[in-house]
Structure formats: structure tokens, C-alpha cells
Amino acid sequence: MLAAIFGLSGPVLTADERAFFRDADPAGYILFGRNVVDRAHLRALTDDLRALHGRDRLFICIDQEGGRVARMKPPVWAAYPPQGQFDRLYDLAPASAIEAARANAEALGLDLAEVGITVDCLPLLDVRQPGADDVIGDRALGGEPLRVAALGRAVLDGLARAGVTGVVKHVPGHGRAGADSHKALPTVTASAAELATDLAPFRSLSQAKIAMTAHVRYTAWDDTAPATLSARVIADVVRGAIGFDGLLLSDDLDMAALTGSIAERAARAQAAGCDLALNCWARMDDMVGIAAALAPMGAATAARIDRALADTDIAPARADARRSDLTARRDALLALLP
């Protein structure tokens, strides 16, 4: 198995993709709006991917957060609120906010499970800081670590109840970055003591099964490389101070925060300690280069993948009725907001 997650170019596999994926055997896939038509189509696509690899439990992920980050959209799928709504509700009624976040995540997870998606890149555990770039903004669960951890745990629990594994991101924290890492490399100059705030939610949820790295440079830890490419940050901070021993996924290697060829980025991420290299844009030359650049997957990474997918369920019972009940409960709680 190749230690990579690849994107697909369109709503069905091309002949070239099918041949390449069969031979390369990537650990999994990430889906975007370009891959999505409707429920029947999306289930057929994910079933095709499972059949191609002969793996019933296949890592198939998506960024389905709610708000401005949603790949599955109305009118086929329901709209979900941005995660920041639960932060706002927490100001008024913390227990209600936690319940609403859990119900929302379970309903959203049912949408994913019934079309064969096993992993959602949610929740964000980034602690939002004043003056940061708005790339996180209302996607965040708040600006206070205990709150972010409590709501993040509720999101993970809700997704798990639906048979979907959540991904905590962007470790070790994107909440104070002054630039959008899609466009440039953010450099955070906060001290190690100040960064304890950023680490706190990740430490609280260090037993999460999957985490995604931040393409952010933290001068207090390593002023030479962003976290994704820093062996020091991954060993000392992610695996060390945070205590995370789950599956570590890079953020998209095609983002402008990183330099070098895509293959070089993948090799550097793996050498730094990322279990899986994420490449979203389905450019065949890049994917072939990544396959050639990556070292064979180690036993520890393979075991982490197995643990991450062990409780996934792509045949949720009573999905429609459960989703209706869950969204009604969420909406009743969010109605408390002024």
C-alpha cells in the first residue's frame, strides 16, 4: 500500500486513473465537489474504489465541515451551519452547544456514511486568535482551549456514532496564523509558552484516530520548515508534547505554503514523520511522481490506518429517520441564539 491519499479528476475514474490506482494501491482518496453528482452516483463511485482495491474499509475522505466548506451541497444534501455557530451557542449555554455540535456531526456523518465515505476532515481544533487570517475564522470552534476541546470531542463523538472517523486539524494549531497557507507560508513567532494555548485542545483529544498537519512555521520550535515538513515539530510537539499516536495526514501538498516539486514535498513530509501524504488535485504526473518518491509504508502506519477505519460503517441503519431527528434537535438548540 502506498502512503498517499489522492484526489480524483472527475465524477468517474478515467481509464488512466483506474490503471494507476490499481498498480500504485494508495492508502485512500479525497473527494471534492468535482467528484459529486448525487447520492446514487457518489455511492457507486466509492463502491468502485473499494472494489478496485478489494478493501471493504477504505480510507475515503472529504472536507465536509458545514458553512463555507462543503463539497456535498444543496439541493441534493442539506446545508449545515458553520462550526462557529456552536461557539456562539456555548457563550449562552455550554451543555446545549455540546449537544447541538454532537447532533449536527452525527447527522452530517450519516450523509457521508450512506454514500460510502469513511473519513471527514473535521473538527478544527485551531484556537482562533485575534488578528489571524480569516482562512480559519468561523470554521473554528472558538478562541478558548477548553471550549474548543469540549466541542471538538462532541464532533468526533457525533461522527463516530454515524460510522465515520473524524480528523482533528490543523496540528499543532493554525489559529494564530497571519496568512492563508493555501496562498503563502504563515510564520508564527509566538513563544513556546504562548503556543501552549494552541496545543491544549490537541492534547485533550490526543486519542483521536487521525490528525492533519498545519503548513505553518513556528519559530519557537523550528524556524527552518513548516510543521508538515519538520521532523522536530512532529517528533517533539505532535508525538511528544501533544502525545498523539494516531494516523498523521499531511495537509494538501499542493498548497503555496510549501516549495519544491510535489514529489519532493511528499518525500519530505514522509521523512519528517507524516504517515500519509495528501495530494488533492489529481494531476497524473504529480501522482506518479509521489508514488516514485515515497518510501514503502511501514508497519506502524499500516496499523494506524487499520485502527482509524476499524469502526467505520458504510451501511448506517435508519439513516433518514435518525438524520431528521438529529437536525431537529440541533435546530431547536441553535434557536436559542439571538
Give the predicted meaning of each segment.
Residues N35-L52, L58, A70, R153-A154, ...:
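Second-shell residues forming the walls of enzyme active-site clefts
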Residues H53-P81, A101-R128, V148, L156-P172:
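Glycine-rich, aromatic-flanked loop segments that form ligand/cofactor-binding clefts
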Residues M1-A3, E65-D91, L125-G137, G166-T187, ...:
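N-terminal small/glycine-rich loop or linker at the start of catalytic domains
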Residues G28-R34, T118-L124, C274-A277:
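Divalent metal-dependent hydrolysis catalytic cores, especially in the metallo-beta-lactamase
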Residues R34-N35, A78-I98, A132-L151, A179-A196, ...:
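Glycine-rich tight-turn/loop motif centered on a GG-T
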Residues M1-A24, G260-P338:
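Preference for extracellular/luminal or secreted protein segments
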Residues M1-I60, G66-V76, P338:
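N-terminal hydrophobic targeting/anchoring segments and the immediately downstream early-domain regions
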Residues H41-A51, A107-L108, I117, D320:
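Charge-biased, low-complexity intrinsically disordered regions
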